[in-house]
UniProtKB/Swiss-Prot annotation:
The protein's name in its UniProt record: Co-chaperonin GroES
InterPro entries assigned to the protein according to its UniProt record, in alphabetical order: Chaperonin_GroES, Chaperonin_GroES_sf, Chaprnonin_Cpn10_CS, GroES-like_sf
Species, as recorded: Myxococcus xanthus (strain DK1622)
Family: Belongs to the GroES chaperonin family.
Keyword Chaperone: yes
Amino acid sequence: MKIRPLQDRLIVKRVAEENKTKGGLFIPDTAKEKPLEGKVIAVGNGKVQEDGKVRPLDIKAGDTILFSKYAGTEIKLDGEEHLILREEDVLGVIEK
């Protein structure tokens, strides 16, 4: 299934966390928190301003982002979990 996000929305796939600590202890899935980092899969056209003009998003497909803990709506695409976020829910772009 393909989804094209609208306006200032993004489709994000969470980045998987490590299964063990730096000390070598394995972390069970029940003890893990959902990661707050993800890779942008698709972006909308931009945010519509009050004057009717569309402002393009600062984020592009392929960016790795950091987002707030309770942000977005969880969806499943082709059996994989994704999030639909608004640009304002993004805290920053991770540059590597």
